[in-house]
A protein has these predicted regions:
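Acidic/histidine-rich catalytic cores of soluble enzymes
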Residues: 35, 81, 199, 203-205, ...
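A short helix->loop->beta-strand "cap" motif at the edges of active sites that frequently abuts
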Residues: 138, 231, 314-318
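Short, small-residue-enriched loops and turns at beta-alpha junctions
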Residues: 89-91, 148-151, 188-190, 239-242, ...
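N-terminal pre-domain/capping segments
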Residues: 1-180, 200-201, 206-210, 257, ...
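Short acidic/histidine-rich active-site segments
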Residues: 319-325
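Short helix-terminating capping/connector loops at secondary-structure junctions
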Residues: 14-18, 227-228, 315
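Conserved Rossmann-like nucleotide-binding pocket used by diverse enzymes
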Residues: 22-24, 234, 321
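Active-site-proximal loop/short-helix segments
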Residues: 184-203, 242
Length: 346
C-alpha cells in the first residue's frame, strides 16, 4: 500500500506531461508557404500537388514560421516548447534573407534558396520570431537543421564551409533561445562497407574511419563554438554515418564535450531491430531533445509507448518533440496522436 501511494504521489499531472513535449514544424511542412523550387530538398512541388497537402491547406490554412508559435498554442494544449525545421525559416517573399546554393545528392544537382541567418534582414526576421514566441507564450527548444553539410566530407574546404554554416545557425539558435541544434554528420548517404581484401581476408573498413575522424574533428569545433553561445550541437540517427548508433556513440565519445549530445529519433533506422536496440544505445547520450516519431514504414513493429519507456528507463529527462513522418493521418492529426501516446507513457 505504501509503495502504491508513493507511486501515485510521484505520478505526473497532465500539465506536467505536456511540459515534457515540444511541437514540431516538420509534420506540417506541407502547409508552410514556400518558394516553388525545382528539385527542392523535400519534394515541394510534388507535395503541394498531393491530395493530402491540398486537404491540409484547406483544413488548417497556410502558415509561415512566424505563425507557428500561435499554432502550437491553438493545437497542442499545454505545450510550450517547439522543434523548428531549418528549411522553413525566413520570409519566402524576401530574397534578401536567402542565399542560392547548388546541392548534390545521389548523382543529381539542384539549386535551392536557403535561409542565411547571418544576413541583416534575416536577423531582423529572427527578432520577429522571438517576439511572436513571447506573444504566444512558447519557446524555441530545438532546431532540426539541414543547412550545414559536408561535416565529414573528404574535401577539407567543403568541410570548413559546412562548419561555417553551422556556426551561423548556432548564433541564430542563441538569438531565438533554442537549447539544441541538430547537425547532420554528412558523408555518403549509404556508408562504405568493409571489404575482405586485407590481410588474411578478414573484413576491414578503412574508408569509414576517415569519415568518422572528420566528423569528430568537425563536431569538436562546433561544440566549442556552441559552448560559447550556449547552444548544444546534437547528432540524430538520420542517414549516412548516423544511421548506425555505434557510429554516433563513437563520435560523441571522441568529441567528449558537454555541448555535444544525441537527439535520438524513434524511427530513423535502417532495419526494425534498431527500433529499440538502437534507441537504447543512444539513450545515455541524450539529455535535451528526442524525436518521438511515428512512421508507418515499420508497421506493427513500432510501439510509441515502448520507445518512450526505453528513454525513461535510461534516465532521460528532456523533451519529446512530436515528429510525425507518415501514416494514416495528416500531419496535425499525426502529431496529436503522438501527443496522446507519449503522454500516456509518461
Amino acid at each position: 500500500m505504501a509503495a502504491s501511494a508513493a507511486t501515485d504521489a510521484s505520478a505526473l499531472t497532465e500539465a506536467q506531461k505536456a511540459e515534457r513535449l515540444a511541437s514540431n514544424t516538420y509534420p506540417i511542412r506541407w502547409i508552410f508557404k514556400r518558394r516553388a523550387t525545382a528539385g527542392g530538398g523535400m519534394g515541394a512541388g510534388q507535395a503541394r500537388t498531393s491530395d493530402m497537402a491540398e486537404q491540409m491547406r484547406k483544413k488548417y490554412g497556410e502558415l509561415t514560421m512566424l505563425d507557428f508559435p500561435q499554432f502550437t498554442r491553438d493545437h497542442f494544449p499545454g505545450v510550450r516548447d517547439m522543434d523548428l525545421w531549418s528549411s522553413l525559416f525566413g520570409d519566402v517573399t524576401d530574397d534578401s534573407m536567402f542565399t542560392q546554393s547548388t546541392v548534390s545528392r545521389e548523382g543529381r544537382s539542384f539549386t535551392s534558396f536557403e535561409f542565411d541567418p547571418s544576413l541583416p534582414t534575416a536577423r531582423k526576421w529572427l527578432d520577429q520570431l522571438v517576439a511572436r514566441q513571447a506573444k504566444a507564450g512558447v519557446r524555441a527548444h530545438h532546431v532540426s537543421n539541414n543547412a550545414p553539410r559536408n561535416i565529414s566530407d573528404l574535401d577539407v574546404d567543403a568541410r570548413k564551409q559546412g562548419i561555417a554554416v553551422a556556426k551561423k545557425w548556432l548564433d541564430a539558435c542563441a538569438q531565438i533561445g533554442a537549447k539544441t541544434m541538430r547537425v547532420n554528420t554528412g558523408g555518403p548517404r549509404i556508408v562504405p562497407s568493409a571489404s575482405t581484401g586485407g590481410q588474411g581476408g578478414y573484413p576491414r573498413n578503412d574508408e569509414i574511419v576517415t569519415y568518422l575522424r572528420n566528423a569528430v574533428e568537425s563536431f569538436k569545433e562546433m561544440a566549442d563554438y556552441g559552448g560559447k553561445v550556449g547552444v548544444k550541437v546534437t547528432i540524430e540517427n538520420h542517414w549516412g554515418l548516423s544511421a548506425d548508433p555505434t557510429n554516433i556513440r563513437i563520435i560523441l565519445d571522441e568529441v567528449s564535450h558537454p555541448f555535444c549530445e544525441a537527439t535520438p529519433d524513434f524511427c530513423n533506422w535502417e532495419h526494425e531491430y534498431l527500433l529499440y536496440h538502437g534507441l537504447k544505445a543512444l539513450t545515455p547520450y541524450a539529455r535535451t531533445t528526442v524525436h518521438a516519431k511515428y512512421w508507418d514504414r515499420w508497421g506493427p513493429q513500432q510501439d510509441v509507448k515502448r520507445s518512450v519507456k526505453v528513454m525513461l528507463d535510461g534516465g532521460y529527462k528532456g523533451k519529446f518533440a512530436l515528429e510525425y513522418e507518415a501514416g494514416p493521418w495528416d500531419g496535425v492529426e499525426g502529431a496529436k496522436y503522438l501527443m496522446k501516446e507519449v503522454m500516456a507513457a509518461l
